[in-house]
């Protein structure tokens, strides 16, 4: 999926307009036996085109089929990036239940593997789930926990990015998805770019 599909077009309009273009990719993902880098990247790129139930189904398939792949050093972060993308797609379409289920799967995976870098971001995304359930005060408190940790660690760029993201999310002004993809430029956010 090319960035131009979404550039300057509201994400929901782009979804309706271009959803059918990705049917063959969805079919491939549902029918492949093993998932590696290619499949996880493809899944993240086409996630926006999937209906919520299909997106959830593909996420559970991705987790199961990428277990061997994730044991190779350096590859586990691709699965974490996939969680982030899928979560943000559910959030964009106000699918609070699916977003919360995705968050719990993601968090369980992070804590089981004791992935400290990902653990720092868990309060932020837990806060986002609370916002989807209309609890803005709890959302702001949880997001602030992540911001405080980033600030204490001296991670200025990441702090700045997540501070901007929290502002957009809490103001319900976040019309994009989170997608870390080296082919589209690292940290691309469709429909949203840092000021």
Language model: regions and residue ranges:
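Hydrophobic alpha-helical segments and helix pairs
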Residues: 1-32
